[in-house]
């Protein structure tokens, strides 16, 4: 059950991160504070996506809380690294994100996935 809550947390946090990235790239920069505040108060699509991203992080924290009650901390924190993989893949697949593929990033993803496999795959008992 803890693994399920952890996966929910990772997926929700990844979607929230993508939402916040979208909002940050479409809202006026905070260096133009009055324009930024006006865009928030107009509550257009960009501001709504910003709010959804923030609410997504809040929901992700609730799922993370449930995860920590059911799953060992060493496994739970390792699970968070999947968010990097999901966001990287989504940025390349989703239209308008312009995520770039590189061998360096692919090597990083391979390291993350290898580490997760080492942590989560069942260990065989050795007889001496």
UniProtKB/Swiss-Prot annotation:
Cytoplasmic side: 1-2, 57-76, 122-128
Stretches that traverse the bilayer: 3-23, 36-56, 77-97, 101-121
InterPro entries linked: Flippase_ArnF, Small_drug/metabolite_transptr
Major location category of this protein: membrane
Pathway(s): Bacterial outer membrane biogenesis; lipopolysaccharide biosynthesis
Gene Ontology BP annotations: lipid A biosynthetic process; lipopolysaccharide biosynthetic process
Matches recorded under NCBIfam families: PRK02971.1-2
Gene Ontology MF term list: carbohydrate derivative transmembrane transporter activity
Topological region Periplasmic: 24-35, 98-100
Name of this protein: Probable 4-amino-4-deoxy-L-arabinose-phosphoundecaprenol flippase subunit ArnF
SUPFAM superfamilies in the record: Multidrug resistance efflux transporter EmrE
Presence of keyword Cell wall biogenesis/degradation: no
Subunit structure: Heterodimer of ArnE and ArnF.
Topology in membrane: Multi-pass membrane protein
Keyword Transcription regulation: no
Record-stated family: Belongs to the ArnF family.
Gene3D superfamilies on file: 1.10.3730.20
Keywords: Cell inner membrane, Cell membrane, Lipid A biosynthesis, Lipid biosynthesis, Lipid metabolism, Lipopolysaccharide biosynthesis, Membrane, Transmembrane, Transmembrane helix, Transport
Subcellular location: Cell inner membrane
């Amino acid at each position: 059950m803890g693994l399920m809550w952890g996966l929910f947390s990772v997926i929700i946090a990844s979607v929230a991160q993508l939402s916040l990235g979208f909002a940050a790239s479409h809202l006026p920069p905070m260096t133009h504070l009055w324009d930024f505040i006006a865009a928030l108060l107009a509550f257009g699509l960009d501001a709504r996506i910003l709010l959804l991203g923030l609410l997504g992080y809040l929901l992700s924290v609730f799922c993370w809380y449930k995860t920590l009650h059911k799953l060992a901390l060493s496994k739970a924190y390792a699970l968070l690294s999947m968010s990097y993989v999901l966001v990287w893949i989504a940025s390349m697949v989703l239209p308008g994100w312009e995520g770039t593929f590189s061998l360096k990033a692919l090597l990083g993803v391979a390291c993350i996935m290898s580490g997760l496999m080492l942590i989560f795959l069942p260990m065989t008992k050795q007889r001496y």
